[in-house]
């Protein structure tokens, strides 16, 4: 579980909501600190601290790209924070003290943020609201990772190339088995075949074997398996996306971003959205 800043800054929704939450939290704690503590509700302090823990937790989950695994847990935790902030805002908004009013304003902003988080994290990935929000991060990620480079395409061509050679070798063995016995009179002219020619032939054979081994080593290795949580239809405008059905098992790798490299059981290779699958190994 690696912490990568790119996971966080690559999601505009994460940046916007966490930044808004930190600003609202600073307003709330500044108002609480400037209020006379003799008449300030003690439980509001716990609500402010609890809200900070929620913001830090969400930031950490985005940094580790595990936010999708704890969405339902977050909904419960944020619902508790929503009760805290709305209760504090209701108790402070009618006060005449400027510090309490400042804290009430911060709690109102935090309540708005908590409500947005509950709707987003509690919503289905295919719901209109979630798809609208995710579209911003998906577009930016597709632009960076959606197109394969010419070198990667060239490597794929090289990995496919050795297949005809194996087919030719098989045909050569069959033709050798069917070749009739040759007498010594038919072998005239082969006495000039030198050992240098033999060494050259061996060098060419070894070179071909090394090329095949190198191509096999360059082939992508899928270290993880994931189960599809929902069915997904690939974007026809992006040739690198793959379609899959719910509960289908995929081989995945490169799981740091919002799009993972995946391979279906049919051998089809492409990219899939990380919020549609769940790691099982």
Swiss-Prot record:
GO terms for biological process: regulation of actin filament polymerization. Residues 168-183 have a biased composition (Polar residues). Residues 221-281 form the SH3 domain. Residues 1-12, 64-73, 122-281 are cytoplasmic. GO terms for cellular component: plasma membrane. Residues 34-42, 95-100 are extracellular. The keyword Membrane applies. InterPro entries: SH3-like_dom_sf, SH3_domain, Sho1_SH3. The keyword Cell membrane applies. It is found in: Cell membrane. Keywords: Cell membrane, Membrane, SH3 domain, Stress response, Transmembrane, Transmembrane helix. Coiled coil: none annotated. It comes from the Eukaryota. The chain crosses the membrane at residues 13-33, 43-63, 74-94, 101-121. Forms homooligomers. Belongs to the SHO1 family. Plasma membrane osmosensor that activates the high osmolarity glycerol (HOG) MAPK signaling pathway in response to high osmolarity. This is High osmolarity signaling protein SHO1.
